[in-house]
Amino acid sequence: MKLFIVKTTCITAFAVALLSGCKKERADTDIYASLDNSIADGSFNDLQAVVNQQAAENGFAGLLSETYGKVADDCPTTTFSAPLGEFPNTMTIDFGESCVGYLGLERSGIIMATFTGPYATAGTTITVTTDNYYVNGNKIEGTKTLVNEGLNDDGNIYFSVAVVDGLITLETGETISWDATRTREWREGEGTLALEDDIYAISDGIGADFAASGINRNGVAFTTHIAEPLVKEMDCIWIVSGILEVTPEGLTTRELDFGDGSCDNNATLTIGAFTTEITLPY
């Protein structure tokens, strides 16, 4: 009987160890921290893209001397709290119940962006909030703040960017919480009012411990670090190049490679020896 108990105990211990090892292996190929970070990142990049679009159309992009004109959306109603050229000025963009337009995405609800000065002027702060705002069925909440920090060493305008209390509620009812601290460099397109030639490079915020942190749809906390600047072209929905490191709590750091500059929704996720392709939502 004693021998049987010992053997049973050994077998049980071995089985537990084996199952634990299998569970750990499965968990370490989990894509949701990377995918959900991309959803949140894309949501708040798109939020800024819409603000930039409407700012350009209404003369907020540069020196407020001219407007660019309608580029895509016919359905949002855009109003201002003060006459053009006066600050602070809150731009309210109302998409109503449904508006398919800029970059082909369906939006509803309201975006509010308060400018303390022209977009391209050093010292300007832009604070963006939402009211019952949805993109392709996902509800976007939170506050995004951009501060125009003037020119960097390369002579390009750059912005410090913060997202506070970001919350994405997916169509399934699952949620992603997200906060971010970034630096956004305006690399190309500053000299024109056209949006499609604007290119931004996004890196970790100056002095920040990480680029973003959040909790994915499965309740797992994660942080991110931008290993190579994420390049955002304003005529493309997705990040076109750059490398992002994502570290879920208690798990191996993943590397998300956004590609070679092509405008597509593909990214390569690497976790140790495991590699897979993921499809970016936007």
What does each model-found stretch correspond to?
Residues C10, F14-V16:
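Hydrophobic alpha-helical targeting segments used for export or membrane insertion
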Residues K23-Y282:
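Low-complexity, intrinsically disordered segments exposed to solvent
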Residues M1-C10:
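Bacterial N-terminal signal peptides that target proteins for export
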Residues L18-G21:
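C-terminal motif of bacterial Sec signal peptides marking the signal peptidase cleavage site
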